[in-house]
């Protein structure tokens, strides 16, 4: 059994003749997202992968076995939804709603691809875009803050989430602090700007400009 613990991401610069001669590891996206895997190559040999956690293999990547031999990765055809629209706006709307659902999406020049899901297929139909079930290789976008395909239960998800939060606070932290300070300053000033004889145990959140003084208001004038 070949033991594989190294990967050269495409484009890797290895001579084309060596790549052509190398056995192929043909896997769907879900299997290519595993750092520990046993698989059978196209020549019948068995291989055991021990790759760094978080590694996602892409079609064209080259694996290096312990004996120095090469294995080329190929993306297997799998059942996916291919989304097309009459214009770019329709495709952008579809991408937006899929992103809100944290769905892995492959972004092409004029199409989107995602793993087949009948619920998402129904949503896309409601968005008035064309979603057709086909068999094709699936190469979704990598995470913006990490190297691959992440879910909430993955070991590296927390790291990616922390990185995303840090970037958010770096760009928005000042504005947030300013708004918070302003809110408390206004509340303090408002609470001391009036003299009332009635009990303050009730929730005092009425707007100043909306408060009308008149008979029965409970204030002494």
Curated annotation (Swiss-Prot):
Bias (Basic and acidic residues) ranges: 171-180, 194-210
SUPFAM superfamilies: Urease metallochaperone UreE, C-terminal domain, Urease metallochaperone UreE, N-terminal domain
GO cellular component assignments: cytoplasm
GO MF: nickel cation binding; unfolded protein binding
Keyword annotations: Chaperone, Cytoplasm, Nickel, Nickel insertion
Family: Belongs to the UreE family.
The protein's name: Urease accessory protein UreE
Species of the source: Cupriavidus pinatubonensis (strain JMP 134 / LMG 1197) (Cupriavidus necator (strain JMP 134))
Lineage: Bacteria, Pseudomonadati, Pseudomonadota, Betaproteobacteria, Burkholderiales
Recorded name of the encoding gene: ureE
């Amino acid at each position: 059994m070949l033991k594989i613990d190294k990967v050269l991401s495409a484009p890797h610069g290895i001579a084309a003749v060596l790549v052509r001669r190398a056995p192929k590891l043909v896997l769907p996206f879900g299997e290519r997202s595993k750092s520990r895997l046993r698989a059978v190559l196209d020549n019948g040999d068995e291989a055991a992968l021990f790759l760094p956690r978080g590694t996602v293999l892409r079609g064209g990547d080259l694996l290096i076995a312990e004996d120095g031999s090469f294995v080329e990765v190929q993306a297997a055809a799998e059942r996916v939804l291919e989304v097309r629209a009459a214009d770019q706006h329709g495709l952008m709307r579809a991408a937006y709603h899929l992103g809100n659902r944290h769905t892995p999406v492959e972004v092409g020049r004029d199409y989107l691809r995602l793993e087949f899901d009948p619920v998402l297929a129904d949503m896309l139909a409601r968005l008035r875009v064309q979603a057709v079930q086909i068999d094709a290789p699936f190469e979704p976008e990598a995470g913006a803050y990490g190297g691959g395909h992440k879910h909430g239960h993955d070991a590296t998800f927390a790291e990616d989430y922390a990185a995303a939060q840090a970037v958010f606070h770096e760009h928005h932290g000042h504005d947030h602090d300013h708004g918070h300070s302003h809110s408390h300053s206004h509340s303090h000033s408002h609470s001391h700007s009036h003299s009332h004889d009635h009990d303050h145990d009730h929730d005092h959140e009425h707007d100043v400009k909306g408060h009308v003084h008149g008979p029965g208001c409970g204030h002494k004038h």
